[in-house]
Amino acid sequence: MPVVAITREMGSLGKDVARGVSEALGIPVIYHEIIDHLADRMRLRKSHVMRLLDGRAGILERMTADQTSLSIFAAEEIVNAALQGNGAVIRGWGATQLLRDMPSVVCVRVCAPFEVRKQRMLERLGTQDADKVAEEIRDNDEAHAAIMLRHFSIDYTDPEQYDLVLNTQRISVAECVDQVLRVVRSPEFAETEAARQRLQDLGLSCQVRAALRRSPRTRGMRVTVKVDQGRVSFDGAGYSAGERAALCEVAAGVPGVRETEDLMRTINLRARFA
């Protein structure tokens, strides 16, 4: 079950690489499906969701949207996509970072120099307005950088964040596809039982976080969720026994959860302010 997560820059031909990998492996490209599901869950327009995920939403859109819920639900949708069917090529918001620690998932960045991307976009759009196209590319790059920094605390251009970085200035789309296929088919990325379990645990942790966000009892709680072979543990501090019990009760209702464990710490306010 090959899973490839791809991030790209505007004008880098990343969409073409994703499509080529999809066709070669006989697996779908997942992007619009995630947007559709999020729009339904958040009761927002698809265009609104896309701008929020891309970091290009206006101030009014940001103020009227629950961005915390959006990021939690987006993570759930992305990891669920990786778990379903016979594999997938997943494009877009945070997929490379959410899945980068999964042993059998190949995380790819497709890039190209700014001037190369600008020329491609001029040709694609059939325009000679180089300044406008350059501004659009810069805005897109800056928005993507801000989103990745805000949600994952990383510089998305750092090659160490990926298994494979492809510069399409001199490497053709076909060669990029071949490079990805070689990595996907290499022994290092073979799907094992242990690798599958890691991905299932990640998926379950995302489902638990989403369930906690949906429940009025736990919606505002900020805790760390860890999953090991279906066993869910919570870590954090500052919550009452009733609130901690609610965490375990909500998590226990998520399919696949075998047991829950409360590792929360109690803050002794009297000692702290004595």
Predicted regions and their residues:
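Pre-Walker A (Motif I) flank of P-loop NTPase domains
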Residues: M1-V4, R8, N86
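Glycine-rich phosphate-binding P-loop
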Residues: A5-R19
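Post-Walker A helix-loop "phosphate-sensing" segment adjacent to the P-loop in P-loop NTPases
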Residues: A24-I30
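Short gly/ser/thr-rich secondary-structure transition/capping motifs
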Residues: S69-F73, A88-G92, A146-R150, P216
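N-terminal targeting leaders
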Residues: D101, A112, Q119-E123, D129, ...
